[in-house]
């Protein structure tokens, strides 16, 4: 939990060889002690001293370190989809940050992002037209959010949008453990194609807030460790799955 910020009951039951009922009882005890807050199917670490929200998403540095090898392959595959003359939207996140790094030598493209680290990196490339969403800074993820950020996406016509995920499944689409995350939904109408970039560990992790329904996603790029069950589930949707 310290590393990922959240845990799922079914994962803990497998790790500790205990029943889900026992795990739920333990999480209930920890909630009473003020260590975690529970949600349906799991729990999140309470971040003391942070007024933004009690149940926070994993910080940017922690995200960047997790599953780094698969994320690099995923980012490289995403970069290959971006061609000269394109306009691209990058949502905030560790995998989309790797995409930004992969665009450091790109020429004649436009990148729109709410990610401060991505914007800082891309600002070094004078051959990129960089558009940064305004709004309120969410310090944990170093990204821009709120109504100002969402309004800045109006009248944008991008070729591709890249979005990460805390969790994804074929029924609920992309979900998050963070409250009030709505900017991804504002990005979708501005893009002709929506591409989710996430490592296979994110499959069947379900946050309590939906970011994007599965119907809004055109392509998922993930690593080759994704299960056959998840592949079959996605075959029943309109989503194209790319494994790397």
Region spans (language model):
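Residues at secondary-structure transition points
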Residues: 65-69, 73, 94, 106, ...
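Structural signal for interior beta-strand "rungs" in well-ordered beta-sheet cores
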Residues: 88-89, 105, 118, 220
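A general structural motif
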Residues: 85, 106-108, 191, 217
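Conserved phosphate- and dinucleotide-binding cores of soluble alpha/beta proteins
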Residues: 3-10, 17-19, 32, 38, ...
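Short glycine/serine/threonine-rich phosphate/pyrophosphate-binding segments
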Residues: 96-99, 205-206
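A short acidic, amphipathic alpha-helical/loop segment
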Residues: 99-102, 233
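HTH-adjacent hinge/linker in prokaryotic transcriptional regulators
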Residues: 2-88, 101-105, 112, 123-127
């Amino acid at each position: 939990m310290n590393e990922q910020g959240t845990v799922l009951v079914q994962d803990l039951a497998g790790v500790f060889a205990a029943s889900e009922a026992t795990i739920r009882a333990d999480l209930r005890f920890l909630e009473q002690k003020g260590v975690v807050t529970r949600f349906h199917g799991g729990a999140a670490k309470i971040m003391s001293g942070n007024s933004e929200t009690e149940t926070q998403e994993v910080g940017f540095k922690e995200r960047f370190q997790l599953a780094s090898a698969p994320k690099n392959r995923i980012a490289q595959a995403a970069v290959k989809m971006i061609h000269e003359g394109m306009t691209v939207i990058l949502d905030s996140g560790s995998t989309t940050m790797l995409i930004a790094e992969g665009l450091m030598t790109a020429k004649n493209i436009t990148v729109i992002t709410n990610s401060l680290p991505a914007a800082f990196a891309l600002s070094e490339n004078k051959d990129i037209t960089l558009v940064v969403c305004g709004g309120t800074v969410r310090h944990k993820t170093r990204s821009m959010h709120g109504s100002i950020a969402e309004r800045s996406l109006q009248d944008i016509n991008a070729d591709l949008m890249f979005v990460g995920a805390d969790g994804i499944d074929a029924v609920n689409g992309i979900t998050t453990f963070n409250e009030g995350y709505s900017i991804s939904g504002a990005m979708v109408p501005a893009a002709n194609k929506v591409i989710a970039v996430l490592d296979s560990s994110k499959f069947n992790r379900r946050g309590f807030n939906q970011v994007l329904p599965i119907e809004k996603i055109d392509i998922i790029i993930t690593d080759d460790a994704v299960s056959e069950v998840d592949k079959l589930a996605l075959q029943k949707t309109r989503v194209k799955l790319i494994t790397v």
